A protein has these predicted regions:
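C-terminal capping/lid region of NAD(P)-dependent oxidoreductase domains
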Residues: 205, 283, 288-297, 305-325
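Glycine-rich phosphate-binding loop and adjacent beta-alpha segment
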Residues: 218-290, 323-325
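Glycine-rich beta-strand-centered segment in the early N-terminal region that forms part
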Residues: 19-34, 46-89
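Short amphipathic alpha-helix with an adjacent loop that forms part of the alpha/beta core around
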Residues: 194-205
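A structural motif shared across PLP-dependent enzymes of the aminotransferase-like
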Residues: 87-100
């Protein structure tokens, strides 16, 4: 099969053997691949959790047909089924997924490209907004970095679960202007010193119940100030920096729960439960088409360098996909 492999000379397309599924794995013939920002570091040779370095195939999600099932895979999954999944090593024509991460396409007419961009956004944001953010009818929720594909899904999930105030942040004015299309009741520019006041004004001075923070870095103390007493901050990403000054006194005074989440250290059993809960809450909306992400651009796997460059330029809105055929 063709795959993009990390080498000392950079990312190179090579022919490699098709992997064989383990007892609880599904082999998927990939038709499309979703790109995620973590792919940039892996493609450059950096570690991302347990993966990285020469010989690594980047990629975290994709869609295609089941080619083969391991001996312990439940019988509801069968060869030939159209599926999408979060999994590793998806910059290739075939990839392996734990069976618990594999979902049948919610719409028989859904394109491969669209399906490939959904798994990471769905499971990440349901886990952050609902499981850890405790979003419920009447909640006030903020998504930091809301114009990313994952962020746009977070806005939609918050509204779907009944949040009455949904704040999205973006420093790009064109992207910020579009956040209302995806459920934001307030869009703020975190480069504007007044953004915390805007959030407080929208919540009658209390602050939001939960912030799903994809930015972190130097914004973290302002984010504390925008969160209510006994609120929650869910640390999903660190696009603004992994290390920064932190106002410990404000954190204590507001008694905020600061929760770190990542899939890098979760077991298969934990991820299976995350996917199960996501399906329980969101699948009907996916089937109805009320949860969707904009597809910014589609590349071919042969154009992997151009696809990564497009993502690195950060000019896209929504998700980027690659097709294999």
């Amino acid at each position: 099969m063709k795959a993009a492999i990390v080498t000392a000379q950079g990312l190179v397309l090579q022919d490699v053997p098709v992997p064989k599924p383990g007892p609880q794995q599904v082999l998927i013939k990939l038709r499309a691949i979703g790109l995620n920002r973590a792919d940039l570091g892996v493609a450059a040779g950096h570690q991302h959790g347990p993966v990285g370095g020469p010989g690594t195939i980047p990629g975290l999600e994709g869609a295609g047909e089941i080619a083969e099932c391991g001996s312990e895979v439940p019988s509801h999954l069968k060869p030939g089924m159209r599926v999408m999944a979060s999994m590793g090593a998806t910059y290739a024509e075939y990839a392996l997924a734990d069976w618990g991460r594999v979902s049948l396409l919610p719409d028989a007419n859904m394109s491969w490209e669209v399906a490939a961009t959904l798994p990471i956004a769905l499971q990440t944001m349901h886990n952050a907004v609902v499981t850890h953010g405790l979003c419920a009818p009447g909640s006030a929720i903020m998504i930091q970095g809301a114009s990313s594909g994952v962020g746009l899904m977070g806005l939609q999930i918050a509204r779907l679960m009944g949040a009455s105030v949904v704040v999205g942040s973006s420093t790009n004015p064109e992207k910020r202007a579009r956040l209302a299309e995806f459920g934001a009741t307030l869009a703020v520019d975190t480069n504007d010193p007044a953004w915390v006041k805007q959030v407080l004004d929208a919540t009658e001075g209390r602050g939001v119940d939960a912030v799903v923070d994809q930015i972190s870095g130097p914004l973290v103390s302002q984010t504390l100030a925008a969160t209510r007493v006994l609120g929650r901050i869910i640390n999903v990403g660190r696009l603004g920096g992994a290390v920064a000054d932190f106002d410990f006194d404000l954190h204590a005074a507001r008694r905020i729960s600061y929760i770190g989440v990542t899939f890098r250290t979760r077991s298969n059993e934990e991820v299976r439960e995350i996917v199960r809960l996501m399906r329980q809450d969101l699948w009907a909306a996916l089937e109805a088409g009320t949860l969707a992400l904009p597809l910014d651009r589609v590349f071919h796997l042969d154009e992997v360098h151009a696809a990564l460059a497009h993502m690195k330029a950060n000019a896209h809105f929504g998700k980027i996909a690659m097709v294999t055929g």
